[in-house]
């Protein structure tokens, strides 16, 4: 802390001078030194490898040790087949021992790209003297690799770098000692272990893990070991492990309570193109409007999760000074002020005229059960024209609404507008709820400028209430399916392109051309996407399946949680409908981020034989990771399984009794895999001790080796900060 309580200024990040140190190869005049100058209009100003056979690399040597925070790649002024589609960057204080700092790829365009390099270990910065760039794949298959320009930036102030260098040297020495300690203990070299630990005063692990090792490996006190594991679970020590596990989706069809005598009228009927919002405080889902296959609807419903019951708030909102019947509109909820806003709708071309094409805008007050018309025509108030299939998000904190995209409805036969036949799309608007004023933030643009955004329909847009950004991806523009993904910072008015959609990561991102419904969890920094059926009839039949994706905002990575892989088609006897909702479009999905539950209602199953068919099924979806209880049971199972195997060697009768009682209760007998594994355990009663050989433990007795392996398995559930080093000393020996 600086004098006067002021916080010390962050060290300045500046360009780091370097020289070319080594290279794998180069072709003709495309010398490695060319990457030192940025000449985007000169096709010869680049390094080009002589071949694309690995390993190809460049090693850069910095003028002096530095914390290398960023690497920037310059490019040629046009796309080029030799640009790096995939590459890795390594760094270290010497060229023989380097750490991976980055694994990424360049877009095949002319824009410079900057990447953040790993420069911290345990929140402590570490220095590099050498940087190694390893190309892995070029944009043109079987082309040599080219790098046009490289810039490194970071901190090279000796006052900052030297302490980091001292720490790094000490850290490496400490890790080497910990690897030795781990090796000595694994091989039961007790004297060497105790002597090294006493001399260096370096801890191999957290005291709790030492206690578990003592009880389990040295004393064979399995009951005490179980107690320590139970304490660890209750203290939340397995939480980090749980957060890193993949989700498993659990769909449940909701069958709401029915009120006697109401018949089918006590819940919303079949529909598509309706809208839903959720009040997470009261656990209430609100549903309004939609299209039932023959007409637009104006009914308004509330579903109470606690009561498991639908309540009809209004059979016809228009009669209560609310919006007329509609579909393909949008709604958003202000949970703080308990108000719902609705904007836009689809109108058939036969009923479009200058009066009907006005874009009305309504607000519903939940507490007073009243509608208020905020605007007869938002376009006249500086807002969007009448649109459908747009997106709308609420920023409760600043009391703002953001709406983006959607197709603008126009009258047919309008001669004066030469663009009338071409579809028009709405831009990005902000509505200040307090002042009731609209502001156009971005017009629809086909330009590829860094702040331009392309309008679309059927896209996803979400507001992250913590980092205050809108996230937009997917959608359609005329017959083009868009695959880009960008964020918009509402406070700084800045667009950040997360992915321009040109990278061919097929299978690693949600496919375009399918109806996507997305939700956001600001606490977990996750975006969830349910990908359903395509609206496009041609694309529909061959690939009918649901898939659920999660985007990790911090790690900038997609993962597919599941695909149903046409399960119903493959197994006609088993109805998919019992397990999960069938693929569809024009449905609605909302997410309760407090209770971590999704709700899905209705939609269009896209049956060509019955085009008017709509759905009225209602589902909840929970994304489940292994629970604390599951992990505790699993750990107890592993401990008791090992205890049983030890007993089986000395007292088979006692072991059999233990198997039937103590081990039996740690198995989930409803799980076929667990049950099968449990049934096979009995074979241990007929094995001799020589059947068990633990790899790499030939110098210690069998029991010690087996217990050590069990200990290493249990350690995996604990946070890295508590555990011994992951590697093994013998792995450092190269042949």
From Swiss-Prot:
Signal peptide: none annotated. Kelch repeats lie at residues 284-330, 339-391, 408-458, 469-515, 526-578, 597-651. Pfam families: Beta-prop_ATRN-LZTR1, Kelch_3, Muskelin_N. Keywords: Acetylation, Cell projection, Cytoplasm, Kelch repeat, Nucleus, Repeat, Synapse. GO terms for molecular function: identical protein binding; protein homodimerization activity. The modification N-acetylalanine is found at residue 2. SUPFAM superfamilies: Galactose oxidase, central domain, Galactose-binding domain-like, Kelch motif. Component of the CTLH E3 ubiquitin-protein ligase complex that selectively accepts ubiquitin from UBE2H and mediates ubiquitination and subsequent proteasomal degradation of the transcription factor HBP1. Required for internalization of the GABA receptor GABRA1 from the cell membrane via endosomes and subsequent GABRA1 degradation. Acts as a mediator of cell spreading and cytoskeletal responses to the extracellular matrix component THBS1. Homodimer; may form higher oligomers. Identified in the CTLH complex that contains GID4, RANBP9 and/or RANBP10, MKLN1, MAEA, RMND5A (or alternatively its paralog RMND5B), GID8, ARMC8, WDR26 and YPEL5. Within this complex, MAEA, RMND5A (or alternatively its paralog RMND5B), GID8, WDR26, and RANBP9 and/or RANBP10 form the catalytic core, while GID4, MKLN1, ARMC8 and YPEL5 have ancillary roles. Interacts with RANBP9. Part of a complex consisting of RANBP9, MKLN1 and GID8. Interacts with GABRA1. Interacts with the C-terminal tail of PTGER3. The LisH mediates head to tail dimerization. This is Muskelin.
């Amino acid at each position: 802390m600086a004098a006067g309580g002021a916080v010390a200024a962050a060290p300045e990040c500046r360009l780091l001078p370097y020289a070319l140190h080594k290279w794998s190869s180069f072709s003709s005049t495309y010398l490695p030194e060319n990457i030192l100058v940025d000449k985007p209009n000169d096709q010869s100003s680049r390094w080009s490898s002589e071949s694309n056979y690995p390993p190809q690399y460049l090693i850069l040597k910095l003028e002096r040790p530095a914390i290398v925070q960023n690497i920037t790649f310059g490019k040629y002024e046009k796309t080029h087949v030799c640009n790096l589609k995939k590459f890795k960057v390594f760094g270290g204080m010497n060229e023989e021992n380097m750490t991976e700092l980055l694994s990424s790829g360049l877009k095949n365009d002319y824009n410079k790209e900057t990447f953040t390099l790993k420069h911290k270990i345990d929140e402590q910065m570490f220095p590099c003297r050498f940087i190694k760039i390893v190309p892995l794949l070029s944009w043109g298959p079987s082309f040599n690799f080219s790098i046009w320009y490289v810039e490194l930036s970071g901190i090279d102030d000796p006052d900052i770098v030297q302490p980091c260098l001292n720490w790094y040297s000490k850290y490496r020495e400490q890790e080497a000692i910990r690897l030795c300690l781990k090796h000595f203990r694994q091989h039961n070299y007790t004297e060497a272990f105790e002597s090294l630990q006493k001399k260096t005063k370096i801890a191999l692990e957290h005291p709790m893990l030492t206690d578990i090792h003592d009880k389990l490996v040295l004393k064979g006190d399995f009951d005490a070991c179980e107690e320590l594991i139970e304490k660890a679970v209750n203290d939340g020590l397995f939480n980090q492990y749980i957060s890193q596990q993949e989700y498993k989706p659990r769909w449940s069809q909701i069958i709401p309570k029915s009120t006697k005598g109401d018949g089918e009228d006590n819940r919303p009927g079949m529909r598509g193109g309706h809208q839903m919002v959720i009040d997470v405080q009261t656990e209430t889902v609100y549903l309004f409007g939609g299209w039932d296959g023959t007409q637009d609807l104006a009914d308004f419903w509330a579903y109470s999760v606690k009561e498991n019951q639908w309540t009809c708030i209004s059979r016809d909102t228009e009669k209560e000074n609310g919006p007329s019947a509609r579909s393909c509109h949008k709604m958003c909820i202000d949970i703080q002020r308990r108000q719902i806003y609705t904007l836009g709708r689809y109108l058939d071309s036969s009923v479009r005229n200058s009066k009907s094409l006005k874009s009305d805008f309504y607000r519903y007050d939940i507490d007073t059960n009243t509608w208020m018309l905020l605007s007869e025509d938002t376009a006249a108030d500086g807002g969007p024209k009448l649109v459908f299939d747009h997106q709308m998000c609420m920023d409760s904190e600043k009391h703002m609404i953001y709406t983006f995209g959607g197709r603008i409805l126009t009258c047919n036969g309008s001669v004066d507008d030469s663009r009338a036949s071409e579809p028009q799309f709405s831009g990005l608007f902000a509505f200040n709820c307090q002042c009731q004023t609209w502001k156009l933030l971005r017009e629809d643009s086909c330009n590829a400028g860094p702040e331009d955004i392309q309008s679309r329909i059927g896209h996803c847009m979400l507001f992250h209430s913590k980092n205050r950004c809108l996230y937009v991806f997917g959608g359609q523009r005329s017959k083009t399916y868009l695959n880009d993904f960008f964020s918009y910072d509402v406070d700084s008015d800045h667009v950040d392109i997360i992915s321009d959609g040109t990278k061919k990561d097929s299978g690693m991102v949600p496919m375009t051309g399918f109806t996507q419904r997305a939700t956001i969890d600001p606490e977990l920094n996750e975006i969830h996407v349910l990908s359903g059926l395509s609206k496009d009839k041609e694309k529909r039949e061959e690939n009918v399946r649901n898939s659920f994706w999660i985007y990790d905002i911090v790690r900038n990575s997609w993962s597919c949680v599941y695909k149903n892989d046409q399960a119903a088609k493959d197994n006609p006897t088993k109805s998919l409908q019992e397990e999960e909702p069938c693929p569809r479009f024009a449905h609605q999905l909302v997410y309760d981020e407090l209770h971590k539950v999704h709700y899905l209602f209705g939609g269009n199953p896209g049956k060509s034989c019955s085009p008017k068919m709509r759905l009225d099924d209602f589902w909840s979806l929970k994304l489940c990771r292994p629970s604390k209880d599951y992990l505790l049971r699993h750990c107890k199972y592993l401990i008791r399984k090992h205890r049983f195997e030890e007993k089986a060697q000395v007292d088979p009768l006692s072991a059999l009794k233990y198997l039937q009682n103590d081990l039996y209760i740690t198995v989930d007998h409803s799980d076929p895999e667990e049950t099968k594994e449990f049934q096979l355990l009995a074979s241990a009663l007929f094995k001799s001790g020589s059947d068990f050989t633990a790899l790499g433990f030939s110098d210690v007795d069998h029991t010690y080796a087996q217990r050590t392996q069990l200990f290493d398995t249990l350690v995996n559930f604990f946070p890295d900060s508590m555990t011994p080093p992951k590697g093994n000393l013998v792995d450092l020996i190269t042949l």
